[in-house]
Amino acid sequence: IHVGRVVRNKTNINKGSISIGSAAVDLAEKHLGNLENKSVLVIGAGKMGKLVAKALAEKNLNAIFVANRTYYVAVELANDLNGHPVLFNELGKYVQTADLIISATGAPHYILNKERLEKTDGDFKDLLMIDIANPRDICEDVCELGVKLFNIDDLREIADENTKLRKKEFAEAENIIDEEFSLLKESFKLIGVEDI
């Protein structure tokens, strides 16, 4: 336990997200600051949507809204998160008030595009959208309205970079473990305990 604490304190081995869900949360915090009191809309309540929604729910959000084509699935996830389910055909109402939109559906076409956003009364200059769907859920033309849009490839790059950084820290962690083990062996010799 002591050695683990020393490794965590003296290295960056546990810094940076390596999962797509955590990378999405980190990216949101980087662009929006503290997520406390932010409003989030999660579109898609499948595996990836759940993963990101659960990571976001830990951030003391003002509100988390969950939309899914199958409404009862949205209700289940929203209940798990103390959030609010959204009917899929009412997305427009929630898009215009969200600070962050995460989209992770299995749709074969765009769910959100510039035309759909223009039909709402929203101001999208401060809106962050993260599209983790494959194929894409959000058309890049939303950026013409001032939306900051990131996709799953951006998140993979973040996760891959963090994985590389962690691997660099492994050597330092091994040195600390070897050093601590040597100190332990020496202390056992001093008190007369046989070699380990």
Predicted regions span which residues?
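Glycine/serine-rich phosphate-binding loop and adjoining beta1-alpha1 elements at the start
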Residues: 1-35
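Conserved, well-folded catalytic cores of nucleic-acid-processing
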Residues: 3, 59, 80, 101-108, ...
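Conserved active-site and cofactor/substrate-binding residues in soluble primary-metabolism enzymes
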Residues: 15, 19, 43, 69-72, ...
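Glycine-rich phosphate/diphosphate-binding loop of Rossmann-like nucleotide-binding domains
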Residues: 25, 29-100
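Short, glycine-/Ser/Thr-/acidic-enriched flexible segments
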Residues: 47, 71-72, 107-108, 134-135, ...
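Short amphipathic alpha-helical segments
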Residues: 53-54, 78-79, 113-117, 140-143
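Rossmann-like NAD(P)-binding element
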Residues: 81-114, 122-130, 134-135
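Adenosine-phosphate binding glycine-rich loop
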Residues: 118-128, 132-196
